[in-house]
Swiss-Prot record:
It comes from Arabidopsis thaliana. The segment S4 is probably the voltage-sensor and is characterized by a series of positively charged amino acids. The pore-forming region H5 is enclosed by the transmembrane segments S5 and S6 in the Shaker-type (1P/6TM) and contains the GYGD signature motif which seems to be involved in potassium selectivity. It is found in: Endoplasmic reticulum membrane. Disruption phenotype: Delayed development and flowering. It comes from the Eukaryota. Expressed mainly in the phloem tissues throughout the plant but also, at a lower level, in leaf epiderm, mesophyll and guard cells. The keyword Transport applies. Residues 725-802 form the KHA domain. This is Potassium channel AKT2/3. A nucleoside 3',5'-cyclic phosphate binds at residues 394-513. The potassium channel is probably composed of a homo- or heterotetrameric complex of pore-forming subunits. Interacts with the phosphatase PPC2A and the kinase CIPK6. May interact with AKT1, KAT1 and KAT3. Interacts with SLAC1.
């Protein structure tokens, strides 16, 4: 992602599909809302990408080339038409065999052949229809894979059910009356009924249709089909029975001479009364075959009744429990929308979200994952999410251990189009990583909204608010169906603190990334106020404020300082951001730091101020700026700089200072001039340089009653008299008492700073003073020289983090 901002407007780089601000009011946003992206027609055809899959084509609804998408509206119309032909075949074939004496009328024969022709076309068409792999849930469009799958599954049965056995029998025998073999082979046409089952299954999950009426129609269809088949079979037995006068049809006078419709109605009447266990007895079995058939039929009815009354209840409640809950939630949501008169945009968003959640439950299986051991759960998260997390700029170069900790706490979510994932100015509770889909960045100002750009696979958002502990700067809204990984901000911060090296790497990535966004306005940063001191800033950003100055990003530095981050924070060498900016020549950063009230007089562990860093680095413009501010608060600043240059015998720096207009006879805080220091140190080159530039050589020996060297010694003696004496010991006081340590301490004069005290202790005891902690006799840590009194006992603890 690459954002470029200017004072008047924002432009986005090409890799984010830049476009100018298009501003519109909130009401206009609803009016311009694209309903097609949330169309219920399209929602019923969505295929969710598997977890962790980024490169997934969401244009699967449309067919391309020779391959037909199973979700294509035209193909679904074809499927519905084929279901109507299946219903025709299922009704006509038993009727022809039973009532037309296996000699169908010419019109029905033509219709049957036309229907078979359509099914033959469908067989050919199936070789070009993509399918959803049951294992990966991906849409397979490869022609070879489609052909292999079809040939290895339903191809043979589809061909067998399409063969016109009656026409073949007529060609072989020369008669239209078919034998029992052809009749049995014709039963293969019932194989087509699976299409009806698939249609009902799909319609039950389509929220555009009433689930109740779809289920009722499905049960009614099953019942009527079985009644029709049983009636035709019962009539067929009577019609083919060799002994006329001994069949159930004899109960109706002149039954064989009545019309075809009367005979069919009588057969259906018997079938229904028998199925419903009414059994009036007017049409009863008259021979053994009929008795056997009725017995079998009654036994079958027992199972069918149990299916309709008992098992179907359990099947609907248990087998379709998720669907029922889904439909109930849809109905409740619709009632809620209507009752509260919500706009159509919100209604579609609610329904779209609920549909996607229903579909995503079968992919997430979170309830199953929660039951697994932690080790297996981590392995699953590693396999699903780690490749996506490794692409994120924030985690470049981070150790695998930290990445595994992060992915173990990530949750996958599917978000529908036009859904606000993060709202502007909301608390930074979560960070999101985009696995698939697109997310728009929207800046809301009053009632105006500006689309700044688009984030895609591998991008992260919400991290600025999380790491800077401030409200979110923008609204992040999905542009298309998106799979996101959600990570709690609190866990991200905790994980960053586990390993200091990884913490520094992530913050470095963060700062370098936003350096590319050179004028990035990250909003009015604010420190968290949860009952804590508001002056305390988050360590994960404050400790790396110097890194911002190192990049020279004055705009980001300004925004961070607005968040009340201290401009005087120091690194391990005591350098402040002003030291770094002055030494590197970043004038803009220097001006920003001065604007936020930084302390110009802070010195690092070597005693160097930012002014000294600027002059030795030859950044004279920065030196003049700093000197102007420093001279206002400290009239001796010029003398201090000249004396420091004289003490170090740095002729080049002395020349540079004099060129900047500093008075060569200016005294430092101790009333000593640079010439006096040079003479005391016996540095003749420096003395000659100062004398050449007009230093007052007369007052050098007439100043009071001392020579320059004597005066320095007198000053040092006076300072020593003012300082107290302290006893220093090595080790923690509690540990020394536990070990009954009798190691003697050392009595020293209290130096002016805590760093000097540590340095002296290191020289006395032979350790690195910068890596120690100073405590009193009770073990309380001392972090200021002002709290130390005369005759205090101080203890130095080595290798402790300060």
């Amino acid at each position: 992602m690459d954002l470029k901002y200017s004072a008047s407007h924002c432009n986005l780089s090409s890799d984010m599909k830049l476009r100018r601000f298009h501003q519109h009011r909130g009401k206009g946003r609803e009016e311009e809302y694209d309903a097609s992206s949330l169309s219920l027609n399209n929602l019923s055809k969505l295929i969710l990408p598997p977890l962790g899959v980024a490169s997934y084509n969401q244009n699967h609804i449309r067919s391309s080339g020779w391959i037909i998408s199973p979700m294509d509206s035209r193909y679904r119309c074809w499927e519905f038409y084929m279901v109507l032909l299946v219903a025709y075949s299922a009704w006509v074939y038993p009727f022809e065999v039973a009532f037309l004496n296996s000699s169908p009328k010419r019109n029905l024969c033509i219709a049957d052949n036309i229907v078979d022709l359509f099914f033959a076309v469908d067989i050919v068409l199936t070789f070009f229809v993509a399918y959803i792999d049951e294992r990966t849930q991906l849409l397979v469009r490869e022609p070879k894979q489609i052909a292999v799958r079809y040939l290895s599954t339903w191809f043979l049965m589809d061909v067998a059910s399409t063969i016109p056995f009656d026409a073949i029998g007529y060609l072989i025998t020369g008669t239209s009356t078919l034998n029992i073999t052809c009749n049995l082979l014709g039963l293969l046409r019932f194989w087509r009924l699976r299409r009806v089952k698939h249609l009902f299954t799909r319609l039950e999950k389509d929220i555009r249709y009433s689930y109740f009426w779809i289920r009722c129609f499905r049960l009614l269809s099953v019942t009527l089909f079985l009644v029709h088949c049983a009636g035709c079979s019962y009539y067929l037995i009577a019609d083919r029975y060799p002994h006329q006068g001994k069949t159930w049809t004899d109960a109706i006078p002149n039954f064989t001479e009545t019309s075809l419709s009367i005979r069919y109605i009588a057969a259906i009447y018997w079938s229904i009364t028998t199925m419903t266990t009414v059994g009036y007895g007017d049409l009863h079995a008259s021979n053994t075959i009929e008795m056997v058939f009725i017995t079998v039929y009654m036994l079958f009815n027992l199972g069918l009744t149990a299916y309709l009354i008992g098992n179907m209840t359990n099947l609907v409640v248990e087998g379709t429990r998720r669907t029922m809950e889904f439909r109930n939630s849809i109905e409740a949501a619709s009632n809620f929308v209507n009752r509260n008169r919500l706009p159509p945009r919100l209604k579609d968003q609610i329904l779209a979200y609920m549909c996607l959640r229903f579909k995503a439950e079968s992919l997430n299986q979170q309830h199953l994952i929660d039951q697994l051991p932690k080790s297996i759960y981590k392995s699953i998260c590693q396999h699903l999410f780690l490749p996506s997390v490794e692409k994120v700029y924030l985690f470049k170069g981070v150790s695998r251990e930290i990445l595994l900790l992060l992915v173990s706490k990530m949750k996958a979510e599917y978000i529908p189009p036009r859904e606000d994932v993060i709202m502007q100015n909301e608390a930074p509770d979560d960070v999101y990583i985009i696995v698939s889909g697109e997310v728009e960045i929207i800046d809301s100002e009053m009632e105006r909204e500006s689309v700044l750009g688009t984030l895609r696979c591998g991008d992260i958002f919400g991290e600025v608010g999380a790491l800077c502990c401030r409200p979110q700067s923008y609204t992040f809204q999905t542009k298309s169906l998106s799979q996101l990984l959600r990570l709690k901000t609190s866990f991200l911060i905790e994980t960053m603190q586990i390993k200091q090296q990884d913490n520094a790497t992530m913050l470095k990535n963060f700062l370098q990334h936003h350096k590319k966004l050179s004028n990035l306005d990250i909003g009015d940063l604010k420190a968290q106020q949860n009952g804590e001191n508001t002056d305390v800033v988050p360590p994960n950003i404050a400790s790396n404020l110097i890194a911002v100055v190192t990049t020279g990003n004055a705009a980001l530095l300004d925004e961070l300082l607005k968040a009340k981050l201290s401009p005087d924070i120091t690194d391990s060498k005591g350098k402040t951001p002003l030291h770094v900016a002055a030494s590197r020549g970043y004038e803009d950063c220097v001006l920003v730091l001065l604007k936020h009230g930084c302390n110009i007089h802070i010195r690092d562990v070597n005693g160097n101020s930012a002014l000294w860093e600027a002059i030795i680095s030859k950044h004279y413009e920065i030196f003049r700026i700093l000197y102007h501010f420093a001279a206002i608060s400290d009239p001796h600043i010029a003398g201090d700089l000249l004396c420091e240059a004289a003490k170090q015998n740095n002729v080049e720096v002395m020349k540079a200072l004099l060129k900047q207009g500093l008075n060569v006879d200016t005294e430092d805080h101790h009333g000593v001039t640079a010439l006096q220091v040079a003479m005391a140190e016996d540095q003749m080159d420096m003395v000659n340089l100062l004398a050449t530039n007009g230093a007052d050589v007369v007052c050098v020996n007439t100043h009071n009653e001392f020579t320059p060297l004597e005066k320095l010694r007198v000053v040092e003696e006076e300072e020593e008299e003012e300082r107290g004496r302290v006893s220093i010991y090595r080790g923690h006081p509690l540990e020394r008492r536990e070990r009954s340590c009798n190691e003697a301490g050392k009595l020293i004069l209290l130096p002016p700073s805590l760093d000097d005290l540590k340095k002296i202790a290191g020289e006395k005891f032979g350790f690195d003073g910068s890596e120690t902690m100073v405590t009193n006799e009770d073990g309380a840590e001392i972090d200021s020289i002002e709290v130390i009194r005369d005759n205090d006992k101080l203890y130095f603890v080595v290798n402790k983090i300060i």
